[in-house]
Amino acid sequence: MSDKELVTQFFMEGYQNKNYGFVLQCLSENYIDHSPAGARSNQEAVNILIAVSKMFSDMQITIADIFSENGMVATRVRYKAIHTGECMGIAATGRSISFEALENFKVVNGKIVESWGYWPDKEIEALLK
């Protein structure tokens, strides 16, 4: 599996299909998450995905852009979901929301070893209000 295929499957299985066992297989033992949520372990990374799935149901993922060079994979991802659980202190609204996020990954020997993510929190908060 190429680095781009690995990252694409990570998104599809983790966010859309909730296949958390697959996500754990994608991550190296020493995985580091540099995003603001900053998972400190592989299980914590899965716990973040589980929390997101409780906030947003019917998650649909579209990889808008994906580039890979020298073990780095850069993505622009479109998310579409229904707000079904508390998020940022805002109770579930039942609204359908869409937003884009940027995620970068370092892949070594077929495993994700590091990631950097940016989700537009202010935009998401505005969509929920």
Give, region by region, the residue ranges found by the protein language model.
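C-terminal and inter-domain tail/linker signature
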Residues: 1-129
